[in-house]
Amino acid sequence: MKSKLKLHGFNNLTKTLSFNIYDICYAETPEDLQAYVQYIDEEYDAERLTQILTDVVDIIGANILNIARQDYDPQGASVTILISEQPVTPTDSQIEESPGPLPDTILAHLDKSHITVHTYPEIHPVDGIATFRVDIDVSTCGVISPLKALNYLIHQFDSDIVTVDYRVRGFTRDIEGRKHFIDHEINSIQNYLSDDTREAYQMTDVNVYQENLFHTKMLLKDFELENYLFGDATRNLSAEQREQVTERLRHEMLEIFYARNMPH
């Protein structure tokens, strides 16, 4: 075990985890598309999001100071939680490069600054495709990385595509006055994901180590069409229609994953 870094004063490093989660579906009729948006809007309303973020606060061991939440018309929701700092002696499991807990195994000890979430349901005007995007930011100041919340959050949403960014900014000084621009080892965000998550997703990294900037994109490997169909009308799709819908959905997912429009 490595000896702990002795600091002069408080740890001033800011660690920010930002990620976007996308859920994709297909509906045959305009009415079913609107029903999907309504379903998502109710399933992930401000109250549900508040509970999810409260669980994140538990995972990172923070104290809630204030919660601001809002449901929007016609759809969407947002929640911001301010969290307080207090002196903490982190355990080895909190600072090592390893996966955080799953939804059914939440345990925690950390303390930090703010968490926000916003939701964005949207539908394609002609192709029957609907997407639901969740943007989450977890920003902490101090010794423990917000990456410990990543594993839990991916399991809380139906995540077809996930884009994750992690950065460390600022510096802290040791007792000899030497600056430290990062206080933990990290080679890849993937090391904070559980084995089942790594096996389920195709992943690619773009990391700028000298800038303490890490980026991982994730695309679900297994594609079961039944998991992407919404509404009663989709039950009557012919084999040819099912093949066409599969192509549309995969094309949509690849465009989101690569962040560019692609030819059909």
From Swiss-Prot:
HAMAP family: AdoMetDC_2. Is synthesized initially as an inactive proenzyme. Formation of the active enzyme involves a self-maturation process in which the active site pyruvoyl group is generated from an internal serine residue via an autocatalytic post-translational modification. Two non-identical subunits are generated from the proenzyme in this reaction, and the pyruvate is formed at the N-terminus of the alpha chain, which is derived from the carboxyl end of the proenzyme. It comes from Pseudomonas paraeruginosa (strain DSM 24068 / PA7) (Pseudomonas aeruginosa (strain PA7)). The gene is speD. Its cofactor is pyruvate. Belongs to the prokaryotic AdoMetDC family. Type 2 subfamily. One of its GO terms (biological process) is spermidine biosynthetic process. It catalyses: S-adenosyl-L-methionine + H(+) = S-adenosyl 3-(methylsulfanyl)propylamine + CO2. SUPFAM superfamilies: S-adenosylmethionine decarboxylase (SSF56276). Binds 1 pyruvoyl group covalently per subunit. The keyword Aminoacyl-tRNA synthetase does not apply. GO terms for molecular function: adenosylmethionine decarboxylase activity. Heterooctamer of four alpha and four beta chains arranged as a tetramer of alpha/beta heterodimers. Its EC number is 4.1.1.50. The modification Pyruvic acid (Ser) is found at residue 113. Pfam families: AdoMet_dc. Pathway: Amine and polyamine biosynthesis; S-adenosylmethioninamine biosynthesis; S-adenosylmethioninamine from S-adenosyl-L-methionine: step 1/1. The keyword Cell inner membrane does not apply. One of its GO terms (cellular component) is cytosol. InterPro entries: AdoMetDC_fam_prok (IPR003826), S-AdoMet_deCO2ase_bac (IPR009165), S-AdoMet_deCO2ase_core (IPR016067). Keywords: Autocatalytic cleavage, Decarboxylase, Lyase, Polyamine biosynthesis, Pyruvate, S-adenosyl-L-methionine, Schiff base, Spermidine biosynthesis, Zymogen. The active site is at 113 (schiff-base intermediate with substrate), 118 (proton acceptor), 141 (proton donor). The record marks 112-113 as: Cleavage (non-hydrolytic). This is S-adenosylmethionine decarboxylase proenzyme. Catalyzes the decarboxylation of S-adenosylmethionine to S-adenosylmethioninamine (dcAdoMet), the propylamine donor required for the synthesis of the polyamines spermine and spermidine from the diamine putrescine.
